[in-house]
């Protein structure tokens, strides 16, 4: 950021945050103003704190130097080259893998873990890229924190 400011880069810069920056027990669906409103998930805390520091740095640079650094919080992304590992994938790739394996093995049902109560938001990776470009081209985007995604439950 410092280099971009010194070089007087006029285009926006986009910092991709993470949904882990929001409190563990934030009301669902999470709103932008939930940032810094409660305790973070302990297992993600160091990562979340680093992301929050970068978000704050974007805001500080914008106020002090008039830069156009944006912070976006992409929701749970899915798309090409996703991680389908049986033990480490996220919700959408895990569901795709389970459905594919069930069809391949001729299973008549698929077991989905959890209660179905937590709400998650999902966004296709190409749509996330389009949203980033759109936001960077806004003249009045300022230093707001931006989120995107569609809330849904997995049952």
What are these regions (language model features)?
Residues 2-3:
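Short, conserved SAM-binding segment of the class I
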Residues 6-7, 11-12, 20-78, 82-87:
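Catalytic helix-loop patch of NAD(P)-dependent Rossmann-fold dehydrogenases
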Residues 7-14, 25-26, 66-68, 107-109, ...:
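Active-site loop of short-chain dehydrogenase/reductase
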Residues 63, 77, 93-110, 120-155:
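Alpha-helical substrate-binding/gating segment
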Residues 82-83, 118-120:
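Heptad-repeat alpha-helical coiled-coil signaling segments
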């Amino acid at each position: 950021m410092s280099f971009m400011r010194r070089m007087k880069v006029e285009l926006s810069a986009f910092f991709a945050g993470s949904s882990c920056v929001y409190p563990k027990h934030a009301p669902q669906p999470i709103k932008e103003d939930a940032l810094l409103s409660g305790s973070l998930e302990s297992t993600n805390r160091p990562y979340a704190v680093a992301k929050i520091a970068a978000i704050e740095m974007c805001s500080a640079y914008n106020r002090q130097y008039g830069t156009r650094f944006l912070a976006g919080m992409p929701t749970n992304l899915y798309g090409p080259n996703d991680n389908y590992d049986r033990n480490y994938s996220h919700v959408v790739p895990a569901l795709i893998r389970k459905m594919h394996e069930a069809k391949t093995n001729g299973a008549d049902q698929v077991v989905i873990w959890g209660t179905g109560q937590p709400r998650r938001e999902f966004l296709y990776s190409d749509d996330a890229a389009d949203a980033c470009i759109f936001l960077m081209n806004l003249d009045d985007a300022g230093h707001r924190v931006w989120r995107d995604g569609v809330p849904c439950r997995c049952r």
